[in-house]
Amino acid sequence: MVIMIGKWIPLERVLRFPEVTPEQVTAALQQCVDQVRNNLPAFEAKFPAANSEHNFYTPGPNTDWTPGFWTGEVWLAYENAKNDSDRFLFRKAGDCQVDSFLKRINIKHYVDHHDMGFLYIPSCVAAYKLTGSVSAREAALKAANQLITRYRPIGE
């Protein structure tokens, strides 16, 4: 019998690693929040490209399959921010990005594919759960409705 931690992690795999202290976890999480904050000037209203050029992700529009990941990081930083100033910055960026996702689904720009979850769950679903944003909810529901159009009962 395999003992699991949560749904996905076998206990035996966890036992192979040294114990991590709560302080180390807290410091690592703060480092992540700091890195997202440091990247906001380049990516507040833009999104990292799907792949790097010379180890640098250039800012660009919400047109590919990966922008939801960055916005998800912004919402995780918002959720874990230690002060109101950071929370304000992350909320402002997250709301701006949600507007971009709503616009994208409204004009149906590159949304007829299976990556809709990558786009809209970490961005708009997260925003709605954290803030109650009406725009985020609208975008997420429209994305879900778009995704369901891909269903084929027999498959093709």
Model-derived features with residue positions:
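Glycan-recognition and catalytic cores of secretory/periplasmic carbohydrate-active enzymes
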Residues: 1-156
